[in-house]
Every structure is written in structure tokens, then in C-alpha cells.
Design a protein with these regions (language model features):
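A ubiquitous, low-specificity "background" feature that marks scattered single residues
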Residues: 11, 21-22, 27, 139, ...
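Residue-level signal for functionally critical sites in structured catalytic/ligand-binding pockets
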Residues: 6, 16-17, 26-30, 267
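Short, intrinsically disordered N-terminal pre-domain segments
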Residues: 1-15
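Collagenous Gly-X-Y triple-helix signature in extracellular proteins
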Residues: 40-277
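Short, surface-exposed terminal/edge motifs of secreted or surface/virion proteins that either
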Residues: 1, 20-39
């Protein structure tokens, strides 16, 4: 019987299989659901455009490291995750810092699906302080160890970032001076509105604000593709300042703001490489 003699099927079910000629050495089959992603194996540039959401297991293996190191990212897509320590460590971008870092290694951006700890935004003696060196800044930096238990400390890439630093203002004129501090060697830190939503929503966009500068100007691809916020029932801080003593947060299923003294969750992200740094 010829293939052309077989009945035509217009819809493929998830458990259907297709025949694969394995380079002339054998005949194998592949499930239809796997074929949908396997066909992009040699097109790593598609990784920031496709959401899959598959479990990658509970260990960061040598195979994972090799695929990241080479920049091929085979069998890794947006939304894929490692489940370790009761947390889903989800891929939200590929090579995010390639446009802002000289000779950046191939990397993935990993954001946990839930809060890793809680903190006030800053302290009473610095109630109008900006994000840089605040309580939540330092607390997020200390959470590098949580990432290291899964990925290994040497695979967490330090990157340059831009943080709101000095602050001058009052409740009447909330921003008459502030500045952005470019700082290297950042391993784990909180995302801002640009990274999650692609634009400023609650953060002040007042003219003359140097601290509005953004290191890449790019939204994490996972959210750019329309993925919902993981575990939206949890509240957590973002690093943007919305008023002279208020910061942006996620709360009540939406972008919100809260005063510096209240505690919210911390969900820092990290850039993970395939080779040691």
C-alpha cells in the first residue's frame, strides 16, 4: 500500500505518532505533541517566541548546561521549569542581557513561580529611600543561595543593571531629583515593571527622572507572549517607586502600590549560564 492510498486525517490528536526516518539507519516514531516543538530544535532564535510550560525535572543536568552553553537551548522553551525545593523555577527569557553586556555568555532568565521570602521595602530611618541598597534590595541579593542549591553558585551570571539610587522629594513634589546607578555584579534582584509588563504602570514617569533609565528596555519574553502571572494570589514587591514613600507591588491580582513599611513577598530573578562564571 502506498502512503497516498491511506485515509486522510485533518486533525492530529496529542497521542498520535508520526514516522521518522532516523538518518537512514532506523525507523522511529515521535508523538505529535513532541513534534510541535522538536521541529524548532535547530532554530534557537525561536526560543523567545514559543511558550511550552514543560517540566524539565528536578535537577540541572549536564545536558541542560551543554544546551545553554552552546546557545542551542534544545528542548527548552519559555515557561519550562525545574521543580525543586517546593518551587517551580521557570524560564522567562533567553539571552536577555546579550544586548546590554559585552561578551555575555549564553544564558536563561529564571524567575520562581512563588515568593522566596518576605520583606518591608526599606527601613524606618530611610523611609523615602529608593530601591538601591534598600531592605528588599539586600534581601533579594541574599536569595542567590536559593538559586545556587539547584543551579550551582558558579552558574549564576553577574550582570549590569540600573537602579534608582538617590532620592529628593516630598509628598507635594515627589521627584525633584533622583538618579540611576549602574552597578555590575548583580546576581539576584527584583524585576521592575518593564520586565513584567513592558511599560511603566504605577511608577512615576515624571519628566527629568534619571532613574527611569532601564538597562535593556525589554520585557521578559514569557510575559510578552501573553503568559499570566504565576501564582497570582501571592503579593510581592517590584523595585519601582511610585510615590515618595510608596513602591510598586503585585497585590489583589493586579499591579498596585504600598507604603514602604508593609511586608510583601520577594521574587528575584537570576541569569543562569551553562558554563561556570
Amino acid at each position: 500500500m502506498k502512503i497516498s492510498d491511506l485515509p486522510i486525517k485533518n486533525v492530529i490528536a496529542s497521542n498520535d505518532s508520526l514516522i521518522v526516518d532516523n538518518n537512514g539507519t532506523s525507523t522511529q516514531r515521535i508523538k505529535a505533541t513532541d513534534l510541535a516543538f522538536a521541529q524548532f530544535a535547530f532554530l534557537p532564535q525561536t526560543r523567545n517566541q514559543i511558550i511550552r510550560g514543560k517540566s524539565l525535572g528536578s535537577a540541572f543536568t549536564e545536558w541542560h548546561k551543554t544546551e545553554i552553553k552552546t546557545g542551542m537551548f534544545n528542548d527548552m522553551f519559555l515557561g519550562d521549569y525545574w521543580e525543586y525545593g517546593g518551587v517551580k523555577w521557570r524560564i522567562v527569557d533567553f539571552n536577555y542581557y546579550n544586548s546590554s553586556e559585552n561578551n555575555a555568555k549564553n544564558h536563561i532568565i529564571v524567575l520562581p513561580d512563588q515568593n522566596l521570602s518576605r520583606s518591608a521595602a526599606t527601613s524606618a530611618e530611610n523611609s523615602t529611600k529608593n530601591y538601591c541598597d534598600s531592605l528588599m534590595y539586600n534581601a533579594s541579593a541574599s536569595l542567590k543561595s536559593r538559586f545556587a542549591t539547584l543551579f550551582g553558585d558558579s552558574h549564576i551570571m553577574g550582570h549590569f543593571d540600573s537602579f534608582a539610587n538617590d532620592y529628593g522629594g516630598s509628598s507635594t513634589y515627589p521627584y525633584y531629583s533622583d538618579e540611576a546607578l549602574a552597578r555590575g555584579g548583580i546576581f539576584t534582584t527584583l524585576p521592575d515593571e518593564i520586565m513584567l509588563f513592558g511599560t511603566h504602570i504605577m511608577a512615576s514617569n515624571q519628566a527629568g527622572r534619571n532613574a527611569n533609565i532601564h538597562i535593556t528596555g525589554r520585557q521578559f519574553a514569557y510575559f510578552k507572549c501573553g503568559a499570566p502571572m504565576p501564582t497570582p494570589t501571592e503579593d510581592f514587591w517590584l523595585r519601582d517607586k511610585s510615590w515618595y514613600n510608596y513602591f510598586v507591588c503585585w497585590r489583589s491580582y493586579r499591579v498596585n502600590q504600598d507604603i514602604w513599611s508593609n511586608q510583601h513577598g520577594l521574587r528575584p530573578f537570576a541569569a543562569i549560564t551553562g558554563e561556570p562564571n
